[in-house]
Amino acid sequence: MTINALLLSSSRVGDTPYLSHALPFIKPLTANAQKWIFIPYAGVSMSYDTYLASVVAGLSELRLDISGIHQHPDPRQAIKDADGILIGGGNTFHLLHELYKYDLVHLIREEVQNGKPYIGWSAGSNVSGLSIRTTNDMPIIEPPSFTALNIVPFQLNPHYSNYRAPGHNGETRAQRLLEFTRVDPITPVVGIVEGSALWRQGDTLSLLGDNPAYLFCGEQQEIPIPVGSDLSHLLK
C-alpha cells in the first residue's frame, strides 16, 4: 500500500463556505473510502460536537459517513475501523498533546503508511510533518514531544503569508522560519498559502491550488514554488 495524504493550508479561502474550496481536492481520496473518523482535538474554543457538525456539513455533498473520535469509547479502535482519517485545524499544541494522551501518534502514522487516506487542514497539516516546530500557534499546552506524524519528512507552515501590517514591529512569518532554518539548516520547510494543498501519493508529492508555496531550507529563503510543481524530491 502507498501513502495517500492531502495536506490543506486552511479550511476556507477568503469568505468561501467551510471546506468548499477543498472539495475537488478531497473527492479523489474518498473514492474507495466511505467511513471516516474526524479528530477534533485542535478545536479548543468550541465543543467537539459543534466542530464535527461543521465538518459533516462542509463535506455533505461527498455523502461520507463521518464520526468524531470523541464519540467512540476506544479511540485507537475507531482509527483502525475507519476507511480514512480527517484532522481539523485549531491549536496544534493541543492537538498533538491529545494525540499523545490517547496513544494515537504511532498508530495514525502506521495506518497512513499502510494506505489509509489522510486529510488534514491547518493544525491537521502541521502534525503531518516531522514536528510541530514551525506552527504559528500559541503553545497553550505542552505535549510530551514536538515530534509529529512524519507523513511527510519535512516541516510545514500552513496559512503562510509574509504580510506585515503598517506600523507593526513584530517579526514576519518569513523571519520566523528563517530562525528555524538557522537552528536546523538541513530540514526543509514548506509554507502553504491559503487555498493550496500538498498531495502525497506514494513517492509523489504535488502542489495543488491557485497559489504558490514557499520553500525555506538553509540559505534558501522564501523560494516560490509554482502551482502544480512536482515536489517529490522532498520525500527523499
UniProtKB/Swiss-Prot annotation:
**Annotated catalytic residues:** S122, D137, H159
Report the EC number(s), separated by commas if there are several: 3.4.13.21
Q: Which InterPro entries match?
A: Class_I_gatase-like, Peptidase_S51, Peptidase_S51_dipeptidase-E
> Where primarily located?
cytoplasm
GO molecular-function terms, A-Z: dipeptidase activity; serine-type peptidase activity
* Localization per Swiss-Prot or TrEMBL: Cytoplasm
Residues spanning the membrane: none
Alphabetical list of CDD domains matching this protein: GAT1_Peptidase_E
* UniProt keyword terms in alphabetical order: Cytoplasm, Dipeptidase, Hydrolase, Protease, Serine protease
Q: Does the keyword Hydrolase apply?
A: yes
First-tier enzyme category under EC: hydrolase
* Keyword field contains Cytoplasm: yes
Q: Which reactions appear under catalytic activity for this entry?
A: Dipeptidase E catalyzes the hydrolysis of dipeptides Asp-|-Xaa. It does not act on peptides with N-terminal Glu, Asn or Gln, nor does it cleave isoaspartyl peptides
Which HAMAP family does the UniProt record give? Peptidase_E
> Any idea what job this protein has?
Hydrolyzes dipeptides containing N-terminal aspartate residues. May play a role in allowing the cell to use peptide aspartate to spare carbon otherwise required for the synthesis of the aspartate family of amino acids.
Q: Which NCBIfam families match?
A: PRK05282.1 (NF003642)
Q: What is this protein called?
A: Peptidase E
Organism of this sequence = Shewanella sp. (strain ANA-3)
Q: Which gene carries the instructions for this protein?
A: pepE
